């Protein structure tokens, strides 16, 4: 290893939406800090943040049925939906602040207003959706949501989905205008361009081989230049591991006790993309269905209008796949090398507990294109095989850990921050809702890792995010102000008009 050692205040590993967000927040809060970024690929936002590797849904729990559950007494628990919705507003406020301050220009390049819809078939599912609607519509966060079980109304909302549909059982949908389509790849690239202008050192094609604690409490990284093969040592006071599926291995290398006992289970995704512009033009919404019985939450099927490179697209999925890789550009040994003595029993327990998931993944992997088309035709009855192509999306690594509620080897489906007790290093693990809540999650990192600075930073945080520390649901006036301001700045007026009435 070379003797050259470079010292900096902050190192961010991975040039995805999480590091982009954290770097941008820190440059607002502590502009004098030196920040260095290492990314093993050739540019920012190539892995999970890339627009082709995620669904591009601004997750605000408007249409995702897995965020609202029916309780044993028949009532609908919307607490998770409220939490995710408020977290998405944190992202919207920060992005609006960045547009207002000139950091982000032309917001339509990364966010567009788009109706979010839930669509179900069958008597029980329709009853569930109606109860969900009745519970949510009275909450100020979900004002403007509509429900219909009238096929004629549904034909107005989703003509492509209703064309030639044989309706022989109850059918229903909810619709809310205030949804969004977010191009997280474009947003990530814009934020890294800004960080470069702010003198952040960004090293592409650089791989972090090792992380270790120095005797004086700093973190030393062994970093390899993938082009020249040169190895350097970089030392920092604070390290953030935002390497997507690569985060677990790096967390394990850090040796912090908080990272022990955690495992990861990789799931890949496939989408179908429509190649006929005439069909694409007939649909304008993100329409989420209900996961089949026994299927995992990330398998909820949805038919999405997307805007990629300013072009309107139509995607359907996801279909799950399995690869032992933790990253799309990872190694086939990733899963195997993540198993350590401290997480072996947890991983084995997860294997036993999740046989249904394993069977589901095997079935999904074995599907032919025509079998995938049959699933698509549940949404688009007129879909023609030659008009749809299969694309491979990104890899997600679901967290496996022991929990009080789930016991040993519980598979987690959320996003999780793991940090050292002294706040000197933090890692982001997990998947959904992921990028949509990036600002909330990175503020959580800052709060946990720099508690002594939060009093000093709080006024600036409130300037950027007026609802910081406040429940928007309980403060309707602030909610109204936030909706109006973010709609104005981000060009979302069309979608939010109904909520502002």
Swiss-Prot record:
Q: What's the protein here called?
A: Probable malate:quinone oxidoreductase
Pathway as given in its UniProt record:
Carbohydrate metabolism; tricarboxylic acid cycle; oxaloacetate from (S)-malate (quinone route): step 1/1
Q: Which reaction does it catalyse?
A: (S)-malate + a quinone = a quinol + oxaloacetate
Query: SUPFAM superfamilies under this entry?
Result: FAD/NAD(P)-binding domain
Q: Which domain of life is it from?
A: Bacteria
Q: Does the keyword Oxidoreductase apply?
A: yes
Supply the alphabetized keyword list.
FAD, Flavoprotein, Oxidoreductase, Tricarboxylic acid cycle
Q: What class of enzyme is it?
A: oxidoreductase
Cofactor(s), names only, from the UniProt record: FAD
Task: Please state which protein family the record places this protein in.
Answer: Belongs to the MQO family.
Q: Do the record's keywords include Flavoprotein?
A: yes
Q: What is its EC number?
A: 1.1.5.4
| Classification via InterPro entries | FAD/NAD-bd_sf, MQO
Q: Which GO terms of type biological process are on file?
A: tricarboxylic acid cycle
């Amino acid at each position: 290893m070379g003797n050259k050692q470079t010292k900096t205040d902050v190192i961010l590993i991975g040039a995805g939406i999480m590091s982009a967000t954290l770097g941008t927040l820190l440059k607002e809060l502590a502009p004098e800090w030196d920040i260095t970024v290492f990314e093993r690929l050739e540019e920012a936002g190539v892995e999970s943040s890339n627009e082709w590797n995620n669904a591009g849904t601004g997750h605000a729990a408007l249409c995702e049925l897995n965020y609202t559950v029916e309780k044993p007494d028949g009532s609908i628990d919307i607490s998770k939906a409220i939490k995710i919705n408020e977290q998405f507003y944190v992202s919207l406020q920060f992005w609006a602040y960045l547009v207002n301050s000139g950091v982000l220009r032309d917001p339509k390049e990364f966010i567009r207003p788009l109706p979010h819809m839930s669509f179900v078939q069958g008597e029980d599912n329709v009853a569930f959706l109606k109860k969900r609607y009745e519970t949510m519509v009275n909450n100020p966060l979900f004002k403007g949501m509509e429900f219909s079980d009238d096929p004629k109304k549904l034909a107005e909302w989703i003509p492509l989905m209703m064309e030639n549909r044989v309706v022989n059982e109850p059918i229903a949908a909810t619709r809310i205008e205030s949804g969004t389509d977010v191009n997280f790849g474009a947003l990530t690239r814009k934020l890294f361009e800004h960080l470069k202008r702010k003198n952040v050192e960004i090293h592409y094609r650089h791989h972090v081989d090792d992380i270790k604690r120095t005797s004086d409490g700093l973190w030393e990284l062994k970093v390899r230049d993938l082009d020249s093969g040169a190895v350097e040592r970089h030392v920092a006071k604070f390290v953030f591991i935002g390497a997507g599926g690569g985060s677990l291995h790096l967390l394990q290398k850090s040796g912090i006790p908080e990272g022990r006992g955690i495992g990861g289970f990789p799931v890949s995704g496939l989408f179908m993309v429509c190649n006929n512009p005439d069909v694409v033009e007939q649909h304008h919404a993100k329409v989420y269905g209900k996961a089949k019985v026994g299927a995992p939450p990330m398998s909820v099927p949805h038919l999405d209008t997307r805007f990629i490179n300013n072009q309107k697209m139509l995607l359907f999925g996801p279909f799950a796949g399995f690869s032992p890789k933790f990253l799309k550009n990872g190694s086939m040994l990733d899963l195997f090398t993540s198993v350590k003595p401290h997480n072996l029993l947890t991983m084995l327990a997860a294997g036993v507990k999740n046989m249904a998931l394993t069977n589901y993944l095997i079935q999904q992997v074995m599907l032919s294109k025509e079998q995938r088309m049959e699933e698509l035709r549940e949404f688009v009855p007129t879909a023609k095989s030659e008009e749809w192509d299969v694309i491979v999306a990104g890899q997600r690594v679901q967290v496996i850990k022991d929990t009080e509620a789930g016991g040993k080897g519980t598979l987690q489906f959320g996003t999780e921050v793991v940090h050292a007790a002294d706040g000197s290093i933090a890692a982001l693990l997990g998947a959904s809702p992921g990028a949509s809540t990036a600002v909330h999650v990175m503020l959580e990192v800052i709060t946990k890792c720099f508690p002594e600075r939060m009093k000093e930073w709080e006024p600036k945080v409130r300037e950027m995010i007026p609802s910081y520390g406040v429940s928007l649901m309980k403060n309707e006036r602030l909610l109204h102000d936030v909706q109006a301001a973010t709609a104005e700045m981000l060009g979302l007026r069309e979608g939010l008009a109904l909520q502002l009435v």
